[in-house]
Each structure stands twice: as structure tokens, then as C-alpha cells.
């Protein structure tokens, strides 16, 4: 690892500004895409578009790259699945885990969550399914990685990817589950060549990554179909630096999430920043209410990403909807009967 350098004066000024509540309003912590956000400071200037902030972010990323530690050979082993989702997403995570096992996948699973999102009963429910649970807030204690707002749910994905115990990872959102055993992805030619697979976002055509965002993140403008991070596959040994870079962009969420939509764009951006190629499942994803059908390299459905109408159980500790089991069945989605049977089983044991 290169000798750590002191931050530049420009970066220090920027970092100091992050502690000034007058410098960056936080009232718009919404889910709209960056181009639809119009949050302004007291001078009606979008602070993240200022030249000094953009330049400081670029320098901060450059200086961070010099501090990325070398991978310690043999410190990570085997392939595994990482899922993020406790709290109100626990039910979705449970269904995803049950489906993974039902389709014959035997890969070990790690479930990562934040403080207050899992109790011992919830851990005991998933442990017999070959799942190890990790409290990311406890794991990150002493660092300043997570923000104190709901954006930390987006930040969690890059953190869990990097800090999981697996050398090769299939990363899943809690509501993205496979329709058949996805283990073959670790042997797919595109993955073997590049060490990473990303999937396209729904209903998107090729477009140029915004020049201003690219400049501030230190990457050249590039044109491609935007990605969707409900599922991705990464060889962390080969892509160790890229995983650290993605974590850095998410740690800078107070800036990054103003110019890209949450965590989903930070992964390809990290690869571009380091000049690393990755494999794409180029077939356009399909939107079939209530979510996205992600395809394999032959155009067959592989993942069902339930971005709307998620599985929930009313009356439980983390319920946030009045939706009842059975009311959200989707006739043309695979494994629906099994999902709702699993939902009923969860209701019987989780109070």
C-alpha cells in the first residue's frame, strides 16, 4: 500500500464544509432521480454543482485510491450470496432466502442489516437455512461510514459486499430472488473474463453518463445502458480495488447521491474510475408489475426483482403496510404459490 498522503487543502475545505449545516441542505432526502431534484441552498445555487465541490470530490477520490490496501492472499474463500435487508425488508429477505433454497442453490448466505433491524428471534428464523447474520452498524462502529438518515440503506450494499467473508459474491437486494439456481453465474464466460457482472435498469436506453457527474467522480463520460443493482456478481479478489472504490463513493453519499440515483450507479462508476472492464447482461430487462424481470445471457428470466408490492406481514414488529398475505399474488410470476406458502409459514412462527 502506498504511503498515506495528507488530504489537499481543497479537500480539507470540502470535508470541513460537511460539518457545516448551512452548507448542504438535507431536507430533500427523497427517492427521485438526480435530474428531478431541485434542492438549493440559501443562495439558490445547487451546491453539488459548484466547481470547487466537484473538484474537491475528484481529488478526494484520487487521494483515496492511493490508500486502498492490498488484498491479503487467502483471506477470503469460496463463493456465497450476500443479501441486505432487515427491518421492514426482513420479510422480503426471508422469502428470497426460501426461494434460493427451493431452487436447489446450496451456496452459503450472509444477511447484512443495520442497528435495530433484527432481533434474536429473526436471526433464529433464518439461521437454519444456512444464513449468517451481520450487524453492519456494529461492524462499522468507530467509523463515519453510515449517514444518520435512510440513505444508509443504500450505503449498506457496498459495505456488505466488501466486508462479507466470501471471495466471490452474488449480491442481492432483499426483494430480488432467482427463479432457478443462479450458481452457474460464477462459471459464465463473461464473469470468468472480467470478474464482475452487472444488469441493466428497466426501460432504459443507452445514454451518456452526465458530464458534470463524471468529472466530479473522476471518470470519463461514457455511454451505456444504466445499471440496476438489485443483483450483481463480483469476484472480490480480482476486483478488490473496485469494491473499495464503490464503498468510497457510497461513503460520500452526502455528495454522490445528489448526482447519481443511490448506490446503483456507484458500482459501474467505480469500475470506470479504475479503468476496469465488467461483463453486462445486455438483454434489456422487462418491467412486469410489480417489478423487474432480469434475464440471463440467453434472454431467459433469472431474477424477479419485486421493486413494488413487496412481501410484508401486518401486525409484526417491522410491518409498514396494511397489505395482507395473499393479496399481492402475481399470476404471471414464477414461484408465487411457494412464496405465499413461505409467507404463511413465517406468519406462524414470527410474532
Which residue stretches match the model-derived regions?
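A glycosyltransferase accessory/donor-loop signature
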Residues: 1-79, 83, 89, 221-351
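Hydrophobic targeting segments
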Residues: 79-83, 100, 109-111
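Histidine-anchored nucleotide/phosphate-binding helix
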Residues: 83, 87-104
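Short, charged/polar "capping" segments at the starts of alpha-helices
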Residues: 90-91, 117-122, 206-207
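Short internal beta-strands
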Residues: 108-116, 198
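Active-site-proximal specificity loops/subdomain of glycosyltransferases
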Residues: 118-164
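GT-A fold catalytic core of metal-dependent nucleotide-sugar glycosyltransferases
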Residues: 135, 153-209, 232-233
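Conserved catalytic core of nucleotide-sugar-dependent glycosyltransferases
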Residues: 144-145, 188-245
Amino acid at each position: 500500500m502506498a504511503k498515506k498522503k495528507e488530504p489537499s487543502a481543497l479537500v480539507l475545505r470540502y470535508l470541513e464544509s460537511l460539518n457545516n449545516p448551512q452548507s448542504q441542505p438535507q431536507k430533500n432526502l427523497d427517492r427521485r432521480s438526480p435530474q428531478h431534484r431541485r434542492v438549493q441552498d440559501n443562495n439558490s445555487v445547487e451546491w453539488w454543482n459548484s466547481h470547487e465541490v466537484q473538484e474537491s470530490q475528484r481529488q478526494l477520490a484520487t487521494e483515496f485510491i492511493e490508500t486502498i490496501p492490498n488484498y491479503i492472499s487467502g483471506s477470503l474463500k469460496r463463493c456465497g450470496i450476500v443479501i441486505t435487508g432487515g427491518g421492514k425488508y426482513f420479510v422480503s429477505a426471508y422469502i428470497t432466502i426460501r426461494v434460493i433454497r427451493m431452487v436447489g442453490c446450496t451456496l452459503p448466505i450472509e444477511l447484512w442489516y443495520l442497528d435495530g433491524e433484527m432481533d434474536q428471534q429473526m436471526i433464529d428464523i433464518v439461521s437454519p437455512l444456512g444464513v449468517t447474520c451481520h450487524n453492519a452498524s456494529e461492524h462499522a462502529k468507530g467509523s463515519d461510514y453510515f449517514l444518520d438518515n435512510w440513505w444508509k440503506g443504500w450505503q449498506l450494499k457496498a459495505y456488505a459486499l466488501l466486508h462479507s467473508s466470501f471471495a466471490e459474491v452474488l449480491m442481492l437486494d432483499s426483494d430480488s430472488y432467482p427463479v432457478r439456481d443462479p450458481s452457474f453465474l460464477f462459471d459464465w464466460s463473461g464473469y470468468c473474463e472480467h470478474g464482475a457482472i452487472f444488469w441493466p435498469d428497466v426501460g432504459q436506453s443507452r445514454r451518456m453518463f452526465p458530464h458534470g457527474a463524471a468529472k466530479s467522480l473522476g471518470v470519463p463520460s461514457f455511454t451505456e445502458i444504466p445499471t440496476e443493482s438489485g443483483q450483481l456478481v463480483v469476484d472480490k479478489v480480482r476486483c478488490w480495488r473496485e469494491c473499495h472504490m464503490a464503498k468510497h463513493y457510497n461513503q460520500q453519499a452526502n455528495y454522490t447521491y445528489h448526482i447519481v440515483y443511490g448506490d446503483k450507479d456507484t458500482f459501474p462508476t467505480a469500475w470506470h474510475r479504475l479503468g476496469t472492464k465488467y461483463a453486462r447482461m445486455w438483454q434489456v430487462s422487462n418491467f412486469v408489475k410489480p417489478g423487474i424481470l432480469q434475464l440471463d445471457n440467453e434472454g431467459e428470466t433469472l431474477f424477479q426483482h419485486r421493486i413494488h408490492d413487496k412481501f410484508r406481514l401486518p401486525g409484526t414488529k417491522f410491518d409498514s403496510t396494511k397489505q395482507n398475505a395473499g393479496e399481492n399474488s402475481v399470476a404471471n410470476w414464477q414461484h408465487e404459490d411457494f412464496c405465499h406458502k413461505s409467507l404463511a409459514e413465517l406468519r406462524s412462527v414470527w410474532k
